[in-house]
Each structure stands twice: as structure tokens, then as C-alpha cells.
């Protein structure tokens, strides 16, 4: 059970960090949505 909790926390933390960086800085990956 502990492994599942730690995995969930790790994924959620990485997701939040990636989300924050993605919205703070312009995505370096070419996206068709922007232009």
C-alpha cells in the first residue's frame, strides 16, 4: 500500500512542477495551438 501512496505523491509532485513550468515559460516544443 505504501508503494502506491509514494508513487501517487511522486507523480502528482512532478505533474504540478511540470504544469507550473509549462504555464510560466513558453513551451519550447512546437505546438500548433499557439501558432
Curated annotation (Swiss-Prot):
Belongs to the PsbT family. The chain crosses the membrane at residues 3-23. It holds the Pfam family PsbT. InterPro entries: PSII_PsbT, PSII_PsbT_sf. This is Photosystem II reaction center protein T. It is found in: Plastid, Chloroplast thylakoid membrane. Keywords: Chloroplast, Membrane, Photosynthesis, Photosystem II, Plastid, Thylakoid, Transmembrane, Transmembrane helix. Found at the monomer-monomer interface of the photosystem II (PS II) dimer, plays a role in assembly and dimerization of PSII. PSII is a light-driven water plastoquinone oxidoreductase, using light energy to abstract electrons from H(2)O, generating a proton gradient subsequently used for ATP formation. The lineage of its organism: Eukaryota, Viridiplantae, Streptophyta, Embryophyta, Tracheophyta. The gene is psbT. PSII is composed of 1 copy each of membrane proteins PsbA, PsbB, PsbC, PsbD, PsbE, PsbF, PsbH, PsbI, PsbJ, PsbK, PsbL, PsbM, PsbT, PsbY, PsbZ, Psb30/Ycf12, at least 3 peripheral proteins of the oxygen-evolving complex and a large number of cofactors. It forms dimeric complexes. It comes from the Eukaryota. PANTHER family: PHOTOSYSTEM II REACTION CENTER PROTEIN T, PTHR36411. It comes from Drimys granadensis.
Amino acid at each position: 500500500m505504501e508503494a502506491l501512496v509514494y508513487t501517487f505523491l511522486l507523480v502528482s509532485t512532478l505533474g504540478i512542477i511540470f504544469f507550473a513550468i509549462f504555464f510560466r515559460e513558453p513551451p519550447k516544443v512546437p505546438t500548433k495551438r499557439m501558432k
